[in-house]
């Protein structure tokens, strides 16, 4: 017997010290395998859109409505089914509406309770009693268990259940009980949640999404590039901090930082009022419709430009320090000719700048922060590192997340696997060593975790810097484009300079041989496995399908980000995997709970 096998057996002997206990566990596990498969729910690219995320989470991407159809078939009208589904999604709000129109609330309570009990029975039937018991709300656990469990010893079951329901109504607990049942159905309908990245980005409330996920009963997270840049910021990586702040200002979401995480923007605001007082910063207007007055808009533009310039300085120093990143083409400030107001890009072409006012750049040392910029970044770094709420949210990403997940025979990740044009795995240099395929994912994730857990300062620093690399590098599995053209989009009019060419993965995901090789690389059976990933919006309005390679690759960019919805034509896709198989759901843009 091998040493490892013996070690596992010794550990099992500690957990199950007798034949009886081991036998009981084997019987229990085998019985669970014979139950219907628990429903998995896949969501991706939430982009801070909490309201839309919450709605999809409540309805389980149609799983709740499907369960209503299973239970009631043709015995309920479509209107009644819709009304019941809405009640399960938003029980309190729906009951407030019903009370305005319903004349006999007692009768409505009774009918509704019985309907919810029937749905609870069906949703609970695919789980063990132990698992259902753990899901029950503490205040009503005993009563709900009585109502959804068949009691063979009770001869007159109808009278028994009637007495319980009538008592619930008589003592004035009907509304609270309905809310408890609705929330239980929401929980039981989805057994496990997969979030395939980009919880953070341009939307207004990623912190609310993280709060909700911290309470969720069973989930895993595949980090997106926007998640990793926030993780880098939380670890104190200054280029990541500047990126996060710039994105928040650009999309008018400083509330995330100031109200959501208590990160003070006053040092930056104070700095720009002096350093950029004579600069109108016209090309740095915020995107979207905001209720800002003229003074707030002017201040926002100055803050936007100031943090963008700081970001470009920090990134320039970073790529020059890490030659192995092979990203020196992203150091652009030294290529500016301030007298001519032009820039010569790495390809040798010269372009006029849309804005040639750089009051904080010393052209002899263009990547050095001024004393004022350094003070701003030191204060921001301290604020990010010492924000307890942010650190708790990042801890959830570390505890429940990773760069990829293998689950129930499927490979889940956010972006793309770096490939050569011939479909072979691209070798990528990470701190002096070459990695490819699964090994590349594993080493990058190891470095990310070292940023938070390593006791060595040098390893921590490498981990912090690798998070910026994962955010922006062409060879990063989470970015996967030729360059991140942030500078060009701000300062150069010519759209050809804005192009970000995608990794070969996106040109080869219809090639079955390449897809099979990727599945095998991660230990999966190509005949049964699937690749499920997000990151790239599916342009349904142009006829694009989210299903690639005869169903072996499924793209579920959630499309929660409102700007993308104008391009894609829908609010993206989510995926359900249950005992019936894989089911894609296309979503209409979410407007409001009232609608």
Task: List the predicted regions and their residue ranges.
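Feature recognizes metal-dependent phosphohydrolase scaffolds
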Residues: 1-595
